[in-house]
Regions:
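Aromatic- and glycine-rich beta-strand/loop motifs that create alpha-glucan
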Residues: 1-25
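Pore- or pathway-lining transmembrane helices of multi-pass membrane proteins that form conduits
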Residues: 19-25, 161-176
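Secretory targeting signals
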Residues: 27-74, 98-168
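Helix-terminus/helix-capping segments at the ends of transmembrane helices and short amphipathic helices
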Residues: 77, 86-87, 158
Length: 176
């Protein structure tokens, strides 16, 4: 299963789409940082958990879309045709699906880490502030539940009808 996981990670992470998505995410993250986190939220310091949470909350819809786009690699028409071949292998289909979902989770983690690294760079450069222990909990609480939900629900919707993933991408924007 490690070989399948590596192959799926390489397929997801070594393409032009990820580079474009990272570029858009980092540009948007920089804009959000300067517009939201830098002035502070509710008269708090820019490096307070409150301001950092507002920064991550604004980035969450874009990361949600990125997570679901990763799943579209596994639900495309080409993948459905290849599923006949993978079903004929002796590998357990559940373990194969778990390896693919884990690869998508690695891609989502990479997107989140890019946004967190940009914030760390800007906090260190602008304020000389590096106390990340106080912001780890807000990052985990804000990012983990919705993104795990996006991957799980997107996986189920994509197995039903692949086009439902694109409709599901609109959810965070409809809730704003």
């Amino acid at each position: 299963m490690i070989k399948i996981f590596r192959c799926e990670c390489r397929r997801l992470l070594c393409n032009k789409f990820l580079i474009g998505l990272l570029a858009v995410l980092l540009f948007y993250a920089g804009q959000v940082f300067y517009a939201v986190a830098l002035p502070g939220v509710a008269h708090t310091a820019p490096f307070s958990p409150w301001s950092f949470g507002a920064y991550l909350g604004r980035l969450l819809p874009l990361v949600w879309v990125g997570a679901l786009f990763f799943l579209t690699f596994f639900t495309s028409a080409r993948e459905r045709r290849a599923a006949v071949l993978t079903a004929a292998t002796p590998a357990d289909p559940r373990r194969y699906a778990l390896a693919r979902c884990a690869a998508a989770l690695v891609g989502v983690a990479l997107l989140c880490l890019a946004a967190l690294a940009l914030a760390a760079l800007l906090y260190a450069r602008l304020f000389g502030w590096t106390d990340w222990g106080s912001l780890a909990l807000p990052a985990l609480v804000i990012l983990a539940p919705p993104l795990v939900f996006a991957l799980g629900s997107g996986w189920l919707l994509g197995r039903l009808r692949p086009w439902l993933l694109y409709v599901w991408m609109l959810l965070p924007f409809a809730l704003e």
